[in-house]
Amino acid sequence: MKLAKYQPTLSLKPTQFSLGVVEVEYKVKKMMKMSRHQLKKFIDEHPIPIVISPWKELCITDHHHFIFACWHANVKKVRVEIVKDFSNSKLSYVQFWKQMAKLNYAYLIDQFGNGPQSPLYLPSDIRGMADDPYRSLAWIVRKEGAYEKNKASFSEFVWSNFFRKKNLLSKQGKHGLKKVVGKAITLAKSAEAANLPGYISPKKLQAVIDQSAERTDYIPKDEKTGPLATAPTLKSDLKKSKTKT
């Protein structure tokens, strides 16, 4: 199926239920500082991988945080790159999503760590994605250097579910992130995390902790640097974004 290089941001269908709002906010601030030329170049350098479904839906397989940030930064169109085209396929709905799961093109665990859920409940566009504070925590812990970025599929969701099982955030949600980053980093270097993607051995990780010795729970005291401190406040929250047209 022939497809224009640039597609409307809201024409793309998510293949996961949730994301981490803190990471989105961080990306939005970065993008808002760019000139129009810089932003165009940045978007061109970060094409959105998509799968075309038998029903001609453009399904995002990665970079959900990036495209959500694009929408909040008022980017109307993004560059896309087709990784699989099922537009001429006779696969049924169930068969298609089984294939998507087999190829690691879909992540059907919801924002509470439950699933896999039916793809019928996936949002029609990125405005309907839910916030998972544990996904934000996993991203912050990686930004702090407690585990390495890697090519494993959905690795930060693996880490988020690891932290979720420890009930670190309880009912605090996003607002409790600063309080638990230190505990999360300690868990990330423990033997319990040894089989998780991007795990760093305790000896190597000690260097990261030594470099962060001046921080309280590995978060800057002056709140002028670091992922949480530099994240701006979005003009509208996720609940409002679901109803925005």
Show where each model-derived region lies.
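Active-site-adjacent structural elements in enzyme catalytic domains
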Residues: 64-66
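Short hydrophobic beta-strand that contains or immediately precedes a catalytic carboxylate
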Residues: 59-62
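Surface-exposed, charge/polar-rich loops and edge strands
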Residues: 1-57, 71-245
